[in-house]
Amino acid sequence: GTAHQPGRMLALKEGGRTTGVAYRLPEETLEQELTLLWKREMITGCYLPTWCQLDLDDGRTVNAIVFIMDPRHPEYESDTRAQVIAPLIAAASGPLGTNAQYLFSLEQELIKLGMQDDGLNELLVSVKKLLAENYPDGVLRPGFA
């Protein structure tokens, strides 16, 4: 998004639980990889990097850095209902593309991993409906607001 049409990141909120993918950084490139990860995730100041215990599918428990949304950030939206954020996602675009494209990319990654999230599915339905109403020809253009 942009300052005029801010997008919405889909981030973790403190205190919840989630299912996801944990990545182990290779020892030989740990410092370089962690530096890249840190720069990418911390550039906006939206996250609180937090050490968390993760329960892996194989029964192991590991410690990992998890980037949790900072509720004090000025762009934080506490109301995560689909009817509130779907219009923002459907309308927002920026130099890297549309916010809807970001959402659809996340959907595809979750499908590849065999994961499903009911809240995300509700959001996808709402955004697709808004886009269909505003782009009847099916061509996704940056921002309609």
Task: Locate each region found by the language model.
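Glycine-aromatic micro-motifs
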Residues: 1-145
